[in-house]
Amino acid sequence: MNKKNYSHSYKLCAGIAFAACTLLTWSCADHYDGDEEWSPQKQNSTLLSPEAEGIKVVASPDGSSMTISWPVVYGAGGYAAFLYNVNDPDSPVLVKSDSIDGCSFNATREEDTNYMLKIRTLGNVKYNNKEAQEETVFNFNTFLPTFKEIPNGTDLTTWFGEAGNLPEDSTSHLCYDLEPGGTYTLSGNIDFGGHQVTLRSSSKSFNAKLTIGSGAKLQTWGGFTLKYLDIDCAQTNKALVELSTTPDDSIKNLVGTANYYFIQDPIVFQGCKVSSLNGALIADGEGGKYVVRTLMINDCIVEIINTSLIPISLRTGSYVTDFTVKNSTIYSLEKNTAAFLQYNGRPKELNDDSEKQCISFLNSTLYQLSYNANFRGDTRTQGQKSNYFTVERCIIVDCGKDNFCQSLLRQASTNPTVSYSKNTYWKDGEDKSANQTGAGCDQTGTALTTDPGFINPAAGNFTPTGSQQVEEKTGDPRWFNQ
């Protein structure tokens, strides 16, 4: 369902507003705590359900939950509320149902989701009030507001070259909607400059399709997000996303004096399927040294076809402060023998003890990456206390050297902060958990040792059949939801 069909959007409030709203959980059925008996204003009536105009949705500060409240209906005996996820309008999914003696309730909140609330006022036998004959239906969503919609069949390079589609003076987050299931092309480079830009399908459930032409790239020196897109890279060997060759000096030396350009807003790949990747997923080009504060690959499938490709290639002198791969599958059709990620910058150069470099792999499936090679190619940060590594609940097959952890850390040192839990280290048909030895490596004793037994990796099916992996549901969770 296209989010624009909804007439109401959620209101995001933080801190005090959220706390105040949660206090609305008192009983909204009329009552009086004094000594005298009290009667409600409404008796011997058929009640109405709360008016949609008075319903409010307030997100928690971290966005993980929300409080939904409505105006009191006098004489009510309570309310029956049903909250649905309607991303697929033909198959609503019940999120929460409750009979409530109050005028609010809490529910989990998902990003980029269409919701429908149905609420009915219940009767009150004591005062002979009957329940409402009709329920109130209230639609809302958790999408970032749309700046412009891009028609199906558009060449993005041509479209963004037209006046007004990328306003030079805008300081807002520019969110562009592509039609769900629509087809789009990128015939040449687009440099979004310092704009914070999101390109997305307007439906979380139905990706738009984007074909990258020969030599075409998406460039930025600001925050940038690709969401819910199927991206075909077969025609190009260039980086899908490249840090701009012409960054503005306004983002230079925000910390320290080492001439780094700082990208403060996140660069995100979310809900994307990237096929036939023959160039880097992201590279730093020739625009100077960058510090990318946040780089995230979340809920993605990335297929690599180049056996010498470095997918995360920041070799000009750049690095990422916080790099995370989460709920994703990244694989090579043939055994890739290059590093998976390469930085050539380091926090130490900023002369600030608070600067960190974090690398995390969470609930992800990695296959045939950096086979018999170092998973991380850089050595400039070896042995430094600024390093943080997290590998948890991942299935790692034919990646790195026999000691995968060492090929990731590139050091035998107690300096970095590390966290491991329930990973599979499988290589050349054998469990390699016993090889994860040395300072900083996985010695938690939590590794899973059964063959993950992917159903058909050659066809891109990484559903595990190994008993321990199935029991623990490790790796990319999508394979358990087929």
Task: List where the protein language model places each region.
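Right-handed parallel beta-helix
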Residues: 222-233, 261-276, 291-308, 319-336, ...
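Beta-strand-rich modules
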Residues: 106-128
